[in-house]
Swiss-Prot record:
Catalyzes the attachment of alanine to tRNA(Ala) in a two-step reaction: alanine is first activated by ATP to form Ala-AMP and then transferred to the acceptor end of tRNA(Ala). Also edits incorrectly charged Ser-tRNA(Ala) and Gly-tRNA(Ala) via its editing domain. PANTHER family: ALANINE--TRNA LIGASE, CYTOPLASMIC (PTHR11777:SF9), ALANYL-TRNA SYNTHETASE (PTHR11777). Its cofactor is Zn(2+). Keywords: Aminoacyl-tRNA synthetase, ATP-binding, Cytoplasm, Ligase, Metal-binding, Nucleotide-binding, Protein biosynthesis, RNA-binding, tRNA-binding, Zinc. GO terms for molecular function: alanine-tRNA ligase activity; aminoacyl-tRNA deacylase activity; ATP binding; tRNA binding; zinc ion binding. InterPro entries: aa-tRNA-synth_II/BPL/LPL, Ala-tRNA-lgiase_IIc, Ala-tRNA-ligase_IIc_anticod-bd, Ala-tRNA-synth_IIc_core, Ala-tRNA-synth_IIc_N, Ala-tRNA_ligase, Ala_tRNA_ligase_euk/bac, DHHA1_dom. Consists of three domains; the N-terminal catalytic domain, the editing domain and the C-terminal C-Ala domain. The editing domain removes incorrectly charged amino acids, while the C-Ala domain, along with tRNA(Ala), serves as a bridge to cooperatively bring together the editing and aminoacylation centers thus stimulating deacylation of misacylated tRNAs. This is Alanine--tRNA ligase. Pfam families: DHHA1 (PF02272), tRNA-synt_2c (PF01411), tRNA_SAD (PF07973). Zn(2+) binds at H553, H557, C655, H659. Binds 1 zinc ion per subunit.
C-alpha cells in the first residue's frame, strides 16, 4: 500500500463517519504569531478549541503538512541520522469540536488500524494516562485489548496541555511493536527508549480547563484532537523499519542518486537531501523565501544543509532544484499547488544554491584547516562564528560537519559572539510576542459600515488610559465603544476611519478606529461638552476620507491581479497599508521589477479602471469561496463566512474592507515607487484618483522647472541631459589624462631617490600638494617602472597624513605586505598585499617609523 493510498484511505474512512475534510493549512500559521511553523494538525483549529471561533461542522479530518525546524520543535540536526526525524512530515488527524468524545475516538482509531489497514491487534500496544479510568475501561472492556499489551503512564507522556493555563486533558497513544528482534521495551518501562515500540497515533481528549492555580475544571464541550504521522504509518504498512525506506522517500532517494555516480543508496546524505527537498519546496509554496531572519532564515539553513550534503556526495551543482519534479511525481496529486509553483520553487532553490556554492568551498577549506590543527575535540566558538558571519554557514551546518569527525563546538563562546552581534544590530526575534497578553473587552459592537457612513448609536463603553470610565470631559483624550457603528476598524491593511460622534451637547472627534475583542473602539478627543455612558449619539464617518480609502483599497486588488499576470503566479501579497492619500502593497518576489514591468502593470490596472466594472461583494463560506477561485491572502485568518470581492473576471479576492462601487471610480492609478524591504519581499507605493493627478502634475512641474534651469524645453530634456553627461565624461577623460601626465612627471622626478637594500628597491617619499587619485596614478607609474619594489608615498596637510604603499608581486611573502607598511607608518589603513592605503594623524616619531621600515627590509 503506497503512502498516497494510506492518506486517501484515512480521509475516506472519516468522510464515511460524518467528518468534514479540511484542506491542509499553510505552513505559516495565520492564527498564532508565537508559532514559527505549523507543526501539528490542530494548529489551524486552535481558536475552535479555545472557544474563540465557530464553524459549520463539528467533525473534521485532515492531512496536514508540518515542519519542525527552528524554535521549540527543531529536528534539523537529527534529520538523516535517525530513522524517524524529519523537517517535513504529514500528520493525519481527526477532530471533534464538542461532538463525539473518548469512546468514538478510540473506536475509530482501532477500527481503522485493524480493519481498514489490517494491522494485527497483537502488534499494537496501548497507553493511557494513569488517572484516566474512563479511557482504560473503553480499551480493556469494550475494545477487548489484552491487558498484557496495555500500560498506564504519567503526566509527562500522557497528559497534554496548550500552555500553563487553558484547555488540557489526558491522551491515549497507540504504538506498533516491531518484534523482539528489535531492542527496546514497552512504553512506560525502563527500556522504552529503544526502537521496538514506535508511537503511531496520539489521541488527545481535551476535557479540562486549567486555571492559574493549576486547578482543573471540566469543559462544557470536551473535544478530541488526534495526530498520526503518515511516514511512520507507511513504514509499518510497508514492513520497513525506517521512514526513509517507504515508497515516497525511496523514489526521491533514487532520483538524487541518479544525479551522481556510484552512490550507495543507504548513504546518510541521500536521506538528508530527500527530506530537505520536501520542506524547502512546501515552505516556498506557502510564501516563505530565503532570508537572514525569521522563517526565511530557517529555510535558508535547510537549503544550505542540503547543498552541503550534495557537495559531500559529489553532485554537480546546481542539483537541488532538479529534485522538484521527482517530488511532484510522488506528492503532486495530493498537493497540486506544488505543480502550479514548480518554476517558482526551482528558480528560488537554484538562486540560493548558486549563492551559497560560491562560499561553500572556501568555508570548508577554512574549517578543515582548523580541524587539522585542533589540539583536542572542541572547535573554537570564534571559528564557528567566522564560518557563520563570513561564509554563511548556519551553526547547525558546522555542527553537522564536525560531528561526523567526532568533534563538537564551543557553543558558549559562539553564543557570546552571537549575543554581541545581536546587541550591536539591536536585532530581536519577531516570534516572542505574547499572543495571549492582549486584554479582552466584554463589549460587543455591530458594524454597519459597508452600507452606511452615518447612523444613530448608543455609548456602551468609555475608556481612558486603558481603564473603563463613566465619563470623559472636554479636552480629554479617550476611547468610545458604541453598540452600533459605521466606523471601519483597522484591519487587513486598511486604516481605521476618522470622523465625529455628535450629541446635543457634546462632540467627540474620532482620530482612529480599532477592533479589540468583539468591540469597535473609537479613539480620539472630546472637543465639546462631556461624554457619559448610555448617551445617544450620531456617528458620522469622514466620508471624503473614506471615499479616498475605498479607491486605494480597490486599486490594491487590481494591482495584485496585475502582478500575478505580469510578474508571475508565485506573487503573494505579504502586507499592505491603505490610507486616503496613498497605498503601499508588499508582495513576494525575488528581484526588482524592471521599468518595462512597472509600465505594463500600470497599463493593465488603468485598462481595468477604464472598463468600469462593477465591484461585486458576495458573502459565502470559506470553502465555497476558495473553490470559486477567490484568492485567499497569505497569512490572513478567515472565519467560516467570508466576503468575496469580484471585479469582472479580472480579480476575485477574499476581503473585509470597504471598496469603490465600480472600478471607474478610481479614475487614475500610478506607481510612484518600487523597492525591496526584505529578502524576497518587494514594496510598491501607489496613488489613485485626485492624488494620482496631483502627483502627475507635481512631476510635470518638476520637469518644466528642470527644463527651464537647463535652458531647454520639456520635450528636449532627455537630449539635453544626455549631452551634458557626454560633455562631463569628456571632461573626466581630460582630467584623467592630465593626472596621468602629472603622475608620470612626479614618478620620473623621484626615481633617483630609490634605495636598494638586499635586492629590494625601497622608495619612501613625501609628496607636496598631491590628491589621493594622483598619488595612486603615481604609484602605478612607479610600480610599472621599478622591479622588486617596496614603495611608500605620503602627503601631510593640516596635520593629517595620507599614505599609499605598493609592493611588487614577485617579492610578496618576502617583504612586508603593503597593508602592514601602511599600518606601521600611520596606524590605520588596509588593503591587499601588493597595494594598500591609510591615513590619520601624523605620528610624532614619523622619522623613527621610516627608519624602522628600512630596518625591516634589511632583516630580510
Amino acid at each position: 500500500m503506497k503512502s498516497s493510498e494510506i492518506r486517501q484511505a484515512f480521509l475516506n474512512y472519516f468522510v464515511q463517519r460524518g467528518h468534514q475534510i479540511v484542506a491542509s493549512s499553510s505552513l505559516v500559521p495565520s492564527n498564532d504569531p508565537t508559532l514559527l511553523f505549523t507543526n501539528a494538525g490542530m494548529v489551524q483549529f486552535k481558536d475552535l478549541f479555545l472557544g474563540l471561533e465557530t464553524r459549520s461542522y463539528q467533525r473534521a479530518a485532515t492531512a496536514q503538512r508540518c515542519v519542525r525546524a527552528g524554535g521549540k520543535h527543531n529536528d534539523l540536526e537529527n534529520v538523516g541520522y535517525t530513522a524517524r526525524h524529519h523537517t517535513f512530515f504529514e500528520m493525519l488527524g481527526n477532530f471533534s469540536f464538542g461532538d463525539y468524545f473518548k469512546r468514538e475516538a478510540i473506536q475509530y482509531a482501532w477500527e481503522f488500524l485493524t480493519e481498514v489497514l489490517h494491522i494485527p491487534a497483537e502488534r499494537l500496544w496501548v497507553t493511557v494516562y494513569k488517572e484516566d479510568l474512563e479511557a482504560e475501561d473503553i480499551w480493556l472492556k469494550e475494545m477487548k485489548v489484552s491487558p498484557e499489551r496495555f500500560s498506564r503512564c504519567g503526566e509527562k507522556d500522557n497528559f497534554w496541555s496548550m500552555g500553563d493555563t487553558g484547555p488540557c486533558g489526558p491522551c491515549t497513544e497507540i504504538f506498533y511493536d516491531h518484534g523482539p528482534e528489535v531492542a527496546g521495551g514497552p512504553p512506560g518501562s525502563p527500556d522504552e527508549d529503544g526502537d521496538r515500540y514506535i508511537e503511531i497515533w496520539n489521541l488527545v481528549f481535551m476535557q479540562f480547563n486549567r486555571d492559574r492555580e493549576g486547578h482543573l475544571h471540566p469543559l462544557p464541550k470536551p473535544s478530541v484532537d488526534t495526530g498520526m504521522g503518515l511516514e511512520r504509518l507507511a513504514a509499518v504498512i510497508q514492513g520497513v523499519h525506517s521512514n526513509y525506506e517507504i515508497d515516497s522517500f525511496q523514489y526521491l532517494i533514487k532520483a538524487i542518486a541518479q544525479l551522481g555516480q556510484d552512490i550507495d543508496l543507504n548513504h546518510t546524505s541521500l536521506k538528508v537531501i530527500a527530506d530537505h527537498i520536501r520542506s524547502c519546496s512546501f515552505l516556498i509554496v506557502d510564501g516563505v523565501l530565503p532570508s537572514n531572519e525569521g522563517r526565511g532564515y530557517v529555510l535558508r539553513r535547510i537549503i544550505r544543509r542540503a547543498v552541503r550534503h550534495g557537495n559531500k556526495l559529489g553532485l554537480p551543482s546546481p542539483f537541488f532544484s532538479k529534485l522538484v519534479q521527482p517530488l511532484i511525481d510522488v506528492m503532486g496529486d495530493a498537493y497540486p499547488e506544488l505543480i502550479n509553483s514548480k518554476a517558482h520553487i526551482e528558480r528560488i532553490l537554484q538562486q540560493e544554491e548558486n549563492q551559497f556554492t560560491r562560499t561553500l568551498e572556501q568555508g570548508l577549506r577554512l574549517l578543515q584547516d582548523h580541524i587539522k590543527n585542533l589540539q583536542g575535540q572542541e572547535l573554537s566558538g570564534e571559528v564557528a562564528f567566522k564560518l557563520y558571519d563570513t561564509y554563511g554557514f548556519p551553526i547547525d551546518l558546522t555542527a553537522d560537519i564536525i560531528r561526523e569527525q567526532g568533534l563538537h563546538i564551543d557553543m558558549e563562546a559562539f553564543n557570546q559572539l552571537m549575543q554581541q552581534q545581536r546587541e550591536q544590530s539591536q536585532a530581536a526575534s519577531q516570534f516572542t510576542t505574547d499572543y495571549h497578553a492582549v486584554s479582552q473587552l466584554d463589549h460587543q459592537s455591530e458594524f454597519h459600515g459597508y452600507e452606511k457612513e452615518s447612523m444613530e448609536a448608543k455609548i456602551i463603553g468609555l475608556l481612558q488610559e486603558g481603564n473603563e470610565v463613566k465619563s470623559i470631559n472636554k479636552g480629554a483624550k479617550g476611547a468610545v465603544i458604541l453598540d452600533h457603528t459605521p466606523f471601519y476598524a483597522e484591519s487587513g491593511g486598511q486604516v481605521g476611519d476618522k470622523g465625529l460622534l455628535i450629541g446635543k451637547e457634546f462632540t467627540f472627534q474620532v482620530d482612529d478606529t480599532q477592533k479589540v475583542g468583539q468591540a469597535v473602539v473609537h479613539y480620539g478627543k472630546v472637543i465639546k461638552g462631556e461624554l457619559t455612558l448610555d448617551l445617544l449619539i450620531h456617528a458620522q464617518v469622514d466620508n471624503i476620507r473614506r471615499d479616498a480609502i475605498r479607491l486605494n483599497h480597490t486599486a490594491t486588488h487590481l494591482l495584485h491581479a496585475a502582478l500575478k499576470k505580469i510578474v508571475g503566479q508565485h506573487v503573494q501579497q505579504r502586507g499592505s497599508l491603505v490610507d486616503a492619500e496613498r497605498a503601499r502593497f508588499d508582495f513576494s518576489h525575488f528581484e526588482a521589477l524592471t521599468p518595462q514591468q512597472i509600465q505594463q502593470i500600470e497599463e493593465v490596472v488603468n485598462a481595468q479602471i477604464r472598463a468600469n466594472n462593477e465591484v461585486i461583494t458576495q458573502v459565502m463560506d470559506i470553502e465555497s469561496a476558495k473553490q470559486s477561485g477567490a484568492v485567499a491572502l497569505f497569512g490572513e485568518k478567515y472565519s467560516d463566512a467570508v466576503r468575496v470581492l469580484s471585479m469582472g473576471d479580472f480579480s476575485k479576492e477574499l476581503c473585509g474592507g470597504t471598496h469603490a462601487r465600480r472600478t471607474g471610480d478610481i479614475g487614475l492609478f500610478k506607481i510612484v515607487a518600487e523597492y525591496g524591504i526584505a529578502s524576497g519581499i518587494r514594496r510598491i507605493e501607489m496613488v489613485t484618483g485626485r492624488y494620482a493627478l496631483a502627483w502627475v502634475n507635481e512631476q510635470l512641474g518638476f520637469m518644466n522647472n528642470l527644463a527651464a534651469t537647463l535652458k531647454t524645453t520639456p520635450n528636449s530634456l532627455q537630449e539635453k541631459v544626455s549631452q551634458l553627461l557626454l560633455d562631463n565624461k569628456n571632461q573626466e577623460k581630460m582630467i584623467a589624462k592630465l593626472l596621468s601626465e602629472k603622475a608620470q612627471k612626479s614618478g620620473a622626478d623621484i626615481l633617483g631617490e630609490i634605495e636598494e637594500i638586499k635586492g629590494i628597491n625601497l622608495l619612501i617619499k613625501q609628496l607636496e600638494g598631491m590628491d589621493s587619485q594622483t598619488m595612486r596614478h603615481t604609484m602605478d607609474q612607479l610600480k610599472s617602472r621599478i622591479d622588486s619594489a617596496v614603495i611608500i608615498l605620503f602627503t601631510i596637510e593640516q596635520n593629517k597624513m595620507n599614505v599609499i604603499a605598493g609592493v611588487s608581486k614577485n617579492i610578496i611573502g618576502k617583504a612586508p605586505s603593503a597593508a602592514q607598511l601602511v599600518r606601521h607608518l600611520c596606524g590605520k589603513g588596509g588593503g591587499r598585499d601588493d597595494m594598500a592605503q591609510g591615513g590619520g594623524g601624523v605620528p610624532e616619531d614619523l622619522n623613527s617609523k621610516i627608519k624602522e621600515i628600512k630596518e625591516m627590509i634589511e632583516k630580510i
